[in-house]
């Protein structure tokens, strides 16, 4: 029986089970040469990474089959959340688990009064890109982070409508300009 649980500063958070899930879920990415740091996280790194955020965890009976983290941030008086560590057990993929977790993620985002959600994924993580587009995220930047050996798409999902975001972030020319600049002047490892 599938169920979704949300953890926030809880001693019951199943960190070890989530660590095992991340390792399993990102094995295919590692084989493709996409080295997600989450795939090798320890329990302590998981705890530290999310800090005061939320883990949304999917269970099939007592087995952890999916997870995603919501991390709250604020900059210039704007509250936003990051959508991180999305993972589904490979044997459970394409069963709607990520979509169910995202519905819970949105509920939590509304509860914590966030303005928008930001997420990133590797340029070649095709299933992740499909997931983001299917769930209403809009591509707004193409970047190369110093901490990753690959190019990344940045996605945004608005919770509240902002004129500034509507006209600057969702503007296709902004994405195209960032794509061209990154491909011309940046290496995949931001070098």
Where are these regions (language model features)?
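C-terminal "cap" of GNAT-fold acetyltransferases
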Residues: 145-191
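A short beta-loop-alpha structural element at the N-terminal edge
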Residues: 1-20
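A short, internal acetyl-CoA/4′-phosphopantetheine-binding micro-motif in the GNAT/acyltransferase core
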Residues: 83-94, 121-122
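Conserved acetyl-CoA-binding loop-helix of GNAT-fold acetyltransferases
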Residues: 88, 94-107, 134
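Conserved beta-strand-loop-alpha-helix junction that forms the acyl-donor binding cleft
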Residues: 119-129, 147
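Acetyl-CoA-dependent GNAT
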Residues: 23-78, 84, 89
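Conserved acetyl-CoA-binding loop of GNAT-fold acetyltransferases
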Residues: 133-143
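Conserved GNAT acetyl-CoA-binding A-motif
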Residues: 109-121
């Amino acid at each position: 029986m599938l169920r979704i649980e949300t953890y926030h500063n809880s001693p019951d958070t199943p960190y070890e089970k989530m660590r095992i899930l991340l390792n399993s879920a990102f094995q295919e990415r590692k084989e493709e040469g996409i080295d997600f740091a989450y795939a090798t996280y320890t329990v302590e790194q998981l705890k530290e990474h999310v800090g005061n955020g939320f883990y949304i965890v999917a269970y099939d009976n007592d087995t952890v089959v999916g997870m995603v983290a919501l991390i709250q941030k604020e900059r210039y008086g704007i509250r936003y959340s990051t959508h991180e560590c999305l993972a589904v057990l490979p044997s459970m993929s394409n069963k709607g688990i990520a979509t169910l977790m995202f519905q819970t993620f949105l509920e939590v985002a509304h509860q914590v009064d966030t303005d928008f959600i930001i997420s990133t994924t590797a340029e070649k993580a095709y299933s992740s890109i499909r997931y983001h587009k299917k769930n209403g995220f809009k591509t707004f930047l193409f970047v190369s982070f110093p901490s990753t050996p690959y190019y990344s798409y940045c996605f945004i999902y608005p919770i509240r409508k902002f004129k500034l975001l509507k006209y600057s972030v969702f503007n296709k020319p902004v994405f195209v300009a960032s794509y061209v600049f990154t491909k011309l002047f940046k290496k995949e490892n931001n070098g």
